[in-house]
């Protein structure tokens, strides 16, 4: 019986049933034969679409209309299909049973469904293809059996499916290709066997599938292919062998003369032989990246006149550029992750139609002229070894729109290298060795990246880039030329505190300003408004300038400027005076005065660092952007940062040592015990200095945080390493202050309990306590700033942060000597002794005066000797040297003063 007679018979039967059942359903009433729990709608005048999906059904509805053309029973709990239950649905064209619990489909389950075209059985529990249930569905065009547990396909299960076009068998448990079952599918056009467990494809596996156009075999375990496994696939255009275990190039593809798209990436293929695609002249696209390819035949890609795209990523052993003779239509070439060191001079002769060239992550050192590739639109050469861009390399590439030369070693670019690129809009030269940048011919650029070129410190005029929208520069100061000055950051606060507000909101706000600005000319006000809008729409330049990357002034405010100058002058002058009075004679210095003198020396270094910053601010006043990159990246900034951290940490460590020394000294004097020798103290001082030196060196070794800003200090925000460094310093210094506080608390508690009846050097104990209190108070803002940064607290304004870093941090170096000069009587005594010594040496130049004073000096020496003898333990309490026989002029003068000093309690 032919097809026309079958159709006539079906139409006659349908007409008879229609007459028996009455008139067809009306649109305004519930269609007859629609289950109450399903959703139904008319499909034309007579047919019905029934949707019973996701209702938790455990069996098929029994009262379905014979005119049902579409039935969706997916996402239910149906586990059985009774035989002949659906045989009445002669007009059914699409049946969906996906997402159920079917484990078996009996013979006759689909009997009578002569109009069925689409059958969906995916996401069930089938372990094999139904052996007889699918037979003789002559109208079936699409069959989905994917996402089951099918491991067996009976040889005759697809018998009679002469109209089947699409077959899904992916995501199952097949271990081989069911050759016998496919022999009856001569009309099949697309089939997927992906996501199975197939290990091998035998010869003639698809021998009778002459109409097959698309074949997916990806994500299997295929490790070998029969040399004739693809024989008979005369119409195949797409072959997907990706994500398998192939060890050898699939030479079986040579019989696929109509193949257009081939993919075998993510395998274990190590070589591509010569003339590998000689039998595939219709190839348009090849994907075989992510293979450990070590060898590619020079002629592997020759004579592929239809090839449009060639992608080969990760072929790490390729050292030569392939010969592409006869592949003149290639439009996109990607050869990344290889070891190609040079390009042939004839590359553009072979590829005149090339539009995209990606040779990134190679070892290219030199580039030939690419002027013959007139159609090039995109070139990607990042991560190579290119040193120089010559004048003729990119000449006359009128269609080139994107050029990526990032992460090379480019140090030289010819002034006219980009002069004939009128269509170029994106240029990436980041992370190179550029010290200059040619701007000729780049008027059309919209995106420019120059970040990472630390030697490129000069400003680039914005007038050369009228179309620029996004630019990335090595230094924030270079963004000042593109409207990125500090006043730009004030505009959002002036006009709108909400960043999401629109320009219309700005205009509404301006409308209210006219009433309060009667004295201003309307035209001038509108002009100012338009200028502000231009600023708001300025070029997006990064890194943006700001308070810590200023365009005009290093210090910003006059308060900071005056504070830095005052701190620097006082720190240098006062510490120099203290150090001079302490170290004016090298013969003998008491332990506490030695510590005060060393603290004064390191505080001088802090004054030097502040003075250098003040001088830089003065010389760059109003034009810091022109010198900011030079200063920030230079050795001077590193020296300033190193001196600042070294001086700050040394001062804290030495102050801690002074507090401990005072406590230990008081303990020894109260018990008349011998103190530790001065050499031990000097060794500890040296250890403190070495520790501070190590701490100050860490930023130089760990990425040079000193160059992070023109302030030359590790900022307590930004990079995690810098924040961690600052927090570690705060914790270490806090520990030092805690130790000092505990030591002095114990000392004063002992004094209150009367454990010490007398204390000789009361002034030094009080002075050290004053230093401790002052330094601790001044360190609190620094500690708070560091911890607030760690906790991402952003309520502290940048000006306050700059004030803390530039004024508060070096302030102890200024106050320490002032406290000693103003409040400590030892300074007055030292100055008096210095005056006496000066007069003594002045008289020594005159013999008459010397003879007159010799008797007086001798008398004083005797008096001082008597004083020393009367106090048997004076050498212990006074920190006198063990050798008291020496009697130089100055020490004897100072020792004479000791006879008049009595032991008094320090209360």
UniProtKB/Swiss-Prot annotation:
GO terms for biological process: epithelial cell proliferation involved in renal tubule morphogenesis; G protein-coupled receptor signaling pathway; hair follicle development; inner ear development; oocyte differentiation; positive regulation of canonical Wnt signaling pathway; regulation of cell population proliferation. The keyword Membrane applies. The chain crosses the membrane at residues 562-582, 596-616, 639-659, 683-703, 724-744, 776-796, 803-823. Residues 1-21 form the signal peptide. Keywords: Cell membrane, Disulfide bond, G-protein coupled receptor, Glycoprotein, Golgi apparatus, Leucine-rich repeat, Membrane, Receptor, Repeat, Signal, Transducer, Transmembrane, Transmembrane helix. SMART domains: LRR_BAC, LRR_SD22, LRR_TYP, LRRNT. Its main location: membrane. GO terms for molecular function: protein-hormone receptor activity; transmembrane signaling receptor activity. One of its GO terms (cellular component) is plasma membrane. The keyword Flavoprotein does not apply. This is Leucine-rich repeat-containing G-protein coupled receptor 5. The gene is Lgr5.
